[in-house]
Amino acid sequence: MILSVLSSLALVSGLMVVRAKNPVHSVLFFILVFCDTSGLLLLLGLDFFAMIFLVVYIGAIAVLFLFVVMMFHIQIAEIHEEVLRYLPVSGIIGLIFWWEMFFILDNESIPLLPTQRNTTSLRYTVYAGKVRSWTNLETLGNLLYTYYFVWFLVSSLILLVAMIGAIVLTMHRTTKVKRQDVFRRNAIDFRRTIMRRTTDPLTIY
């Protein structure tokens, strides 16, 4: 019951993200999609990933989108025109996505896809008593720091390069950018900077 409710809310919220005319409402529905997804992950027993969804996507990205949309005064009429312009392309992409999903999900619950499997030689084995039960965090840490530690280091280096690149771009000096010298600005004597105008408006001392 809870799974059906959360799935339905996620689908409706995802539809309202692209259908809402107000950008702020779209971002709020976007946040609701991630809340429903976190609930689905909790039902699946993936508590760590559910918390990651809440912290990363809602706490950082969605809030950033919300502030950006609220700062930029976007006209609703312009958004409606843009949506109508790209509606055929988005429809084609949606049809391709559903076509791929029907062919990737080789499941017996889909009647259009007949499965050809030999189920007579399958044996059901209960592995719960044979292995030690690990939590999601322990399993992720074991895989991340043993088998995939090289890719973990590579991703860390990529993030480091991106951070250094952002700092270098902000500190790059060009001749076209006008900047103020703070030391010279503070050292100016304001009593000598006041100009005296005579009776002749063209003469300034």
UniProtKB/Swiss-Prot annotation:
It is a multi-pass membrane protein. Keywords: Electron transport, Membrane, Mitochondrion, NAD, Respiratory chain, Translocase, Transmembrane, Transmembrane helix, Transport, Ubiquinone. It catalyses: a ubiquinone + NADH + 5 H(+)(in) = a ubiquinol + NAD(+) + 4 H(+)(out). It comes from the Eukaryota. One of its GO terms (cellular component) is mitochondrial membrane. The chain crosses the membrane at residues 48-68, 86-106, 150-170. Its EC number is 7.1.1.2. GO terms for molecular function: NADH dehydrogenase (ubiquinone) activity. The keyword Mitochondrion applies. Belongs to the complex I subunit 6 family. Core subunit of the mitochondrial membrane respiratory chain NADH dehydrogenase (Complex I) that is believed to belong to the minimal assembly required for catalysis. Complex I functions in the transfer of electrons from NADH to the respiratory chain. The immediate electron acceptor for the enzyme is believed to be ubiquinone. Complex I is composed of at least 49 different subunits. PANTHER family: NADH-UBIQUINONE OXIDOREDUCTASE CHAIN 6 (PTHR33269:SF17). A stretch of 270 kb of the mitochondrial genome is duplicated within the centromere of chromosome 2 resulting in the duplication of the gene. The expression of the duplicated gene (At2g07731) is not demonstrated. It is also probably not RNA edited and therefore differs in all the positions known to be edited. This is NADH-ubiquinone oxidoreductase chain 6. The gene is ND6.
